[in-house]
Amino acid sequence: MAEDQFPGWHGTTIIGVRKGDEVVVAGDGQVSLGQTVIKGSARKVRRLSPGGYDVVAGFAGSTADAFTLLERLEAKLEATPGQLQRASVELAKDWRTDKYLQKLEAMLIVTDGKDLYVITGAGDVLEPEHDVAAIGSGGNFALAAARGMMDSDRDAETVARDAMAIASDICVYTNGNLTVERIGK
């Protein structure tokens, strides 16, 4: 998330790790305005259950915008039960083409325990090549750290937590107060 994209507001780090039979999404709790930490315990990872279909989503960017997108994703999942990819593509298409949604400033990581995607306002639905996705100001740090741990005997949650710890040590807009959600295949 670039500084010019969200003037004055900085950061968060969200990571999704798929390893073995589980996927973990973790996010830090820091919200900053300029050089000031406004809140240290924000919850940016959520469990959704549209129609009994379990999905975990993490977001970076404007909270209100992210909630709008999560509501839209839930509606897409209710319309296409059990089809996260299709619902994600439909959300990305709407986000890209709808004049109201185009103004929303957020990114999402979503998983159903099988698939893992990053959804952007540019219309992208990206599936990571190496079973790790990360977004936000500390996303590149967390991504690099997690990729370095994927061949170890650590489970998905340990990889996510350790990668977030590294990101929070490097990125001043990321803290170590984590929300972690696990979901199995």
UniProtKB/Swiss-Prot annotation:
Pfam families the UniProt entry points to: Proteasome
Top-level taxon of origin: Bacteria
Molecular-function annotations in GO: metal ion binding; threonine-type endopeptidase activity
Active site location: T12
Primary enzyme class: hydrolase
Keywords, alphabetical: Allosteric enzyme, Cytoplasm, Hydrolase, Metal-binding, Protease, Sodium, Threonine protease
InterPro entries reported in the protein's UniProt record: ATP-dep_Prtase_HsIV_su (IPR022281), Ntn_hydrolases_N (IPR029055), Proteasome_sua/b (IPR001353), Proteasome_suB-type (IPR023333)
Cited SUPFAM superfamilies: N-terminal nucleophile aminohydrolases (Ntn hydrolases)
Predominant place of localization: cytoplasm
Compartments where found: Cytoplasm
GO cellular component terms, semicolon-separated: HslUV protease complex; proteasome core complex
Reaction(s) catalysed (UniProt annotation): ATP-dependent cleavage of peptide bonds with broad specificity
BP terms from Gene Ontology: proteolysis involved in protein catabolic process
Assigned EC number: 3.4.25.2
Record PANTHER family: ATP-DEPENDENT PROTEASE SUBUNIT HSLV, METALLOPROTEASE TLDD
Subunit structure: A double ring-shaped homohexamer of HslV is capped on each side by a ring-shaped HslU homohexamer. The assembly of the HslU/HslV complex is dependent on binding of ATP.
Function noted in UniProt: Protease subunit of a proteasome-like degradation complex believed to be a general protein degrading machinery.
Stated family: Belongs to the peptidase T1B family. HslV subfamily.
Protein name, UniProt field: ATP-dependent protease subunit HslV
